A protein has these predicted regions:
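Conserved structured core elements
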Residues: 1, 21, 207, 254, ...
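Active-site diphosphate/adenylate-binding microenvironment
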Residues: 4, 12-14, 22-34, 339-422, ...
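Phosphate/pyrophosphate-binding active-site segments
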Residues: 129, 165-166, 187, 282-384, ...
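Short, internal active-site loops enriched in acidic
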Residues: 156-159, 386-387, 534-536
């Protein structure tokens, strides 16, 4: 058996269904021969974003795989790998490498060394017989601990080497439980607190700890907010839901965090970022995380509980029930306060959410979108900048993994690949990306990939003909050189690539256009709806 076939056989045993990539990489062709569907993209970054989403929407039960050629293909891939690393997403990256005799010749790009800073592990194959061990190490790291890309670089002169046999059994995920003493202390602190808040990060998604999070919240009548990455970990139509954090946040999140006397973060890193909610100063914090490197990193904690989010929450529920009993606390008073705060905040935004203006209010577009889709059967993601901040505070998720939030680093154009990868892994769902006229300039050509590969996503494009949030930052550049002016006819662009494209300019046409776009996706055709919007820059910040 040759190296390429051995790699494909390992991928088959690991349950891989798709190999996303760009030629030349022999896994694409040999995988196709073995029944693994190759997905060929127009630019490597989008393919990595697709692999990223496959892992996300399955909580890592299916792992996204991306492969590319050595040299320019690997170099082009850097941004997509870096994005997955910053968001702690496990993906398998399989670049070809230069022949071993040339691998260290300047200036050949050596992925397994150059990408060590943006991967959880990066390893070259120096001998074909080592392939089972190398892949076993990679998949163990992908399934265990904090997520991140694992990279295996296969030199071009290794692909045709022979392997006698494959001794390979897929490794199982490893999970670590918490220190019982820390759990008991955390339970006591939560029971003593008068105004605690639960803050859930994306670790709840990876651990599939949604039932435990809900049980703990209901047992202690604790309001729950999430990070942007953790959004949808707790149903946002629940009486105890506050919504999600981010650069823009609901008024409920601001109110309850500010008044909290204890914040319990679970499955989160508390990383300081411009695109996350800042923890109020001076609050006691319990930090439950899988990664000890996150403890006291950016936010000082009173107590750390290390372990898998599901195991931590299950142990904490047992400890609370042992100390308090199994009867849930009365959630009535806090639920009323949440409802009052939410209603007052939302009322202040209703003029924008229901505006009849032309150009359109982006808030009106997204409000109408939310009320035109089956929320429970939809997966949606934002893009960098205004689309993120205009969408995330107002979109109310009801099902786990129905919102792909991100923000540790914010590459424009990330959302398109996320929606496409989500649709691959969850074809029964309506998968939507919301982006602007800046983001489409980075990855828009891969809308053609969605058409060609029969991935019927719904793409919501907010076009205000400029980089609106840069106007105040670049007044001279704009006045003298129109440097912030960007745009095009993106509905026509979508049609030219074989998709459904429609431009919408009047408020009364928003909902009918959304329905036509959804109908197109149901026929198997990707749809791009281009909404001509105002230069809106106000977001829900406090």
């Amino acid at each position: 058996m040759r190296t390429a076939d051995a790699i494909v056989e390992i991928l088959r045993r690991e349950g891989v269904e798709w190999v996303i990539g760009y030629p030349v990489n022999h896994v694409l062709e040999r995988g196709a021969a073995a029944g693994l569907r190759p997905i060929i993209v127009r630019q490597e970054r989008t393919g990595l974003h697709m692999a990223d989403a496959v892992s996300r929407v399955t909580s890592g039960r299916k792992l996204g795989v991306f492969c590319m050629q050595h040299g320019p293909g690997t170099e082009n891939s850097y941004g997509g790998i870096a994005q997955a690393f910053s968001e702690s997403v496990p993906i398998l990256v399989l670049p070809m490498g230069y022949a071993r005799r040339l691998a260290w010749v300047q200036r050949n790009y050596h992925a397994s060394t150059q990408m060590q800073g943006i991967t959880k592990s990066a390893e070259p194959v120096t001998s074909a017989k080592e392939i089972p061990a190398i892949f076993r190490r990679a998949f163990t790291r992908l399934r265990s601990g904090r997520g991140g890309p694992a990279l295996i670089e296969v030199p071009v002169d290794v692909w045709n080497e022979e392997i006698d046999s494959i001794d390979y059994v897929p490794p199982r995920a490893l999970r670590c439980g918490p220190d019982p003493a820390a759990v008991r202390e955390a339970a006591s602190l939560l029971l003593q607190a008068r105004r605690p808040v639960l803050y859930a990060g994306q670790g709840v998604h990876w651990a599939e700890a949604w039932p435990e999070l809900r049980r703990l919240a209901e047992l202690l009548a604790i309001p729950v907010c999430t990070s942007l990455g953790g959004k949808s970990a707790f149903p946002e139509n629940h009486p105890l839901a506050l919504g999600s954090g981010g650069l823009a946040i609901p008024g409920t999140v601001h109110h309850f965090l500010r008044q909290a006397d204890l914040i319990f973060g679970v499955g989160c890193s508390f990383t300081e970022t411009s695109f996350g909610v800042a923890m109020p100063k001076g609050k006691p914090i319990i930090h439950a995380t899988l990664d000890p490197l996150d403890v006291n990193k950016d936010v000082a904690c009173s107590l750390a509980v290390l372990g898998d989010a599901k195991l931590v929450l299950a142990a904490l529920i047992d400890a609370v029930e042992h100390q308090h009993g199994t009867t849930a606390k009365d959630a009535g008073p806090v639920a009323r306060e949440i409802r009052e705060q939410h209603d007052a905040w939302l009322a202040s935004w209703m003029p924008k959410l229901t505006a009849d203006d032309a150009p359109l209010s982006p808030y009106r577009v997204l409000w109408d979108l939310q009320h035109s889709v089956d929320i429970a059967n939809t997966i949606i993601t934002h893009d960098a900048g205004s689309p993120r901040d205009q969408l995330s505070p107002f979109w109310r998720c009801t099902e786990p993994l129905s919102y792909l939030g991100w923000g540790k680093t914010t590459q424009l154009g990330y959302g398109l690949g996320l929606a496409m990868g989500a649709k691959l892994a969850k074809p029964e769902r309506l998968c939507i990306n919301v982006w602007g006229d800046a983001a489409i300039g980075f990855t828009g050509m891969d809308f053609e990939t969605a058409v060609r590969e029969r991935i019927p996503i719904l793409s919501i494009l907010l076009n205000n003909f400029c980089m609106a949030i840069e106007l105040k930052i670049m007044p001279v550049s704009t006045e003298k050189y129109r440097s912030t002016d960007i745009s095009g006819d993106y509905a026509a662009f979508a049609r030219a690539l074989g998709g459904y494209g429609e431009r919408v300019e009047r408020p009364d046409d928003i909902v009918p256009a959304i329905r036509r776009g959804i109908a197109a996706t149901e026929r198997g055709q990707p749809a791009l709806l281009e909404f001509i919007t105002s230069k809106e820059v106000e977001v829900s910040r406090f």
